Amino acid sequence: MQARNIGLDVSVPEKECTDPHCPFHGNLPVRGQVLTGKVISTAMTRSVVVAREYQQYIPKYERKATKIKKYHVHVPDCIELRVGDTVRFAECRKLAKTISFVVVEKVKQ
């Protein structure tokens, strides 16, 4: 099965899969936001938790505070991830109650 073009400038995984929720080998369209974050948990089946850090200015204290936003992200079978990997993930339709993003590329380990 040949990987399809998903419309993003990302590298296609070398491994093939039969996951219907894979943007490359299945029929899941990606749209909207494309974000980058760090994998903090791989305990779920075919899914991971990805954290993004950002700074928010607090006027009362005239300081910036670091905050963390967590995303539940689906991982296709053709992409292998471990805790600590940096990944690029894209928005898609809802796959579960809390999952509406899918991993499209592993940036670095």
Swiss-Prot record:
GO terms for cellular component: cytosolic small ribosomal subunit. InterPro entries: NA-bd_OB-fold (IPR012340), Ribosomal_uS17 (IPR000266), Ribosomal_uS17_arc/euk (IPR028333), Ribosomal_uS17_archaeal (IPR019978). It comes from Thermoplasma volcanium (strain ATCC 51530 / DSM 4299 / JCM 9571 / NBRC 15438 / GSS1). The keyword Ribonucleoprotein applies. Gene3D superfamilies: 2.40.50.1000. Part of the 30S ribosomal subunit. One of the primary rRNA binding proteins, it binds specifically to the 5'-end of 16S ribosomal RNA. GO terms for molecular function: rRNA binding; structural constituent of ribosome. It comes from the Archaea. Keywords: Ribonucleoprotein, Ribosomal protein, RNA-binding, rRNA-binding. GO terms for biological process: translation. The gene is rps17. Belongs to the universal ribosomal protein uS17 family. This is Small ribosomal subunit protein uS17.
